[in-house]
Amino acid sequence: MANLERTFIAIKPDGVQRGLVGEIIKRFEQKGFRLVAMKFLRASEEHLKQHYIDLKDRPFFPGLVKYMNSGPVVAMVWEGLNVVKTGRVMLGETNPADSKPGTIRGDFCIQVGRNIIHGSDSVESAEKEIHLWFKPEELIDYKSCAHDWVYE
């Protein structure tokens, strides 16, 4: 079997406030991905500036940091075959108006500034984001009893 990879997924403050945490986790679990870490926290502005450092020169950066700091987030690490790419497909487009029904953003969002969820856009970004949000000992290694029913 091919190597499993990990991705970082964060439910943003609007997703938390709207009670979508369970629905989002359910979708990743039902797909067959394995949750290996999860935190419920209010991220500091400095932490968020580091997370979004690639966007620091964009005009929306201050508003993005303020929005992400406006309430709690659920930070997660999911593992599975092609989880980065598949996770991004499950999320839908960054702009919910461009997202298809059946995707998280297509089903639950209207505006880009309130798009409820973040997902790593590459394996390299995932590694960086996981390292930023979690200590190595917070990533739990276990074999899911469903593993053999999901993977050949």
From Swiss-Prot:
Catalytic residues as annotated in Swiss-Prot or TrEMBL: H118
Tissue expression profile of the protein: Expressed in the base region of the oxyntic and pyloric mucosae.
Disruption phenotype: Impaired activation of the K(+) channel Kcnn4, resulting in defective T-cell activation.
Location of this chain's protein in the cell: Cytoplasm; Cell projection, Lamellipodium; Cell projection, Ruffle; Nucleus
Necessary cofactors: Mg(2+)
Catalytic activity: a 2'-deoxyribonucleoside 5'-diphosphate + ATP = a 2'-deoxyribonucleoside 5'-triphosphate + ADP; a ribonucleoside 5'-diphosphate + ATP = a ribonucleoside 5'-triphosphate + ADP; ATP + protein L-histidine = ADP + protein N-phospho-L-histidine
Superkingdom of origin organism: Eukaryota
InterPro entries: NDK-like_dom, NDK-like_dom_sf, Nucleoside_diP_kinase, Nucleoside_diP_kinase_AS
Coiled coil (residue ranges): none
Broad class of the protein's primary localization: cytoplasm
Family annotation (Pfam families): NDK
GO BP terms, alphabetized: CTP biosynthetic process; dTMP biosynthetic process; GTP biosynthetic process; integrin-mediated signaling pathway; negative regulation of apoptotic process; positive regulation of DNA-templated transcription; positive regulation of epithelial cell proliferation; positive regulation of keratinocyte differentiation
Region of interest (Interaction with AKAP13), ranges: 1-66
Sample GO molecular function, one term: GDP binding
Ligand binding (ATP): K12, F60, R88, T94, R105, N115
Record's GO cellular component terms: cell periphery; cytoplasm; lamellipodium; mitochondrion; myelin sheath; nucleus; ruffle
Enzyme class: transferase
Enzyme nomenclature, EC number: 2.7.4.6, 2.7.13.3
Keywords from the named record: ATP-binding, Cell projection, Cytoplasm, DNA-binding, Kinase, Magnesium, Metal-binding, Nucleotide metabolism, Nucleotide-binding, Nucleus, Transcription, Transcription regulation, Transferase
Family indicated by similarity: Belongs to the NDK family.
Quaternary structure, from the entry: Hexamer of two different chains: A and B (A6, A5B, A4B2, A3B3, A2B4, AB5, B6). Interacts with CAPN8. Interacts with AKAP13. Interacts with ITGB1BP1 (via C-terminal domain region). Interacts with BCL2L10.
Purpose of the protein: Major role in the synthesis of nucleoside triphosphates other than ATP. The ATP gamma phosphate is transferred to the NDP beta phosphate via a ping-pong mechanism, using a phosphorylated active-site intermediate. Negatively regulates Rho activity by interacting with AKAP13/LBC. Acts as a transcriptional activator of the MYC gene; binds DNA non-specifically. Binds to both single-stranded guanine- and cytosine-rich strands within the nuclease hypersensitive element (NHE) III(1) region of the MYC gene promoter. Does not bind to duplex NHE III(1).
Protein name: Nucleoside diphosphate kinase B
High-level lineage: Eukaryota, Metazoa, Chordata, Craniata, Vertebrata
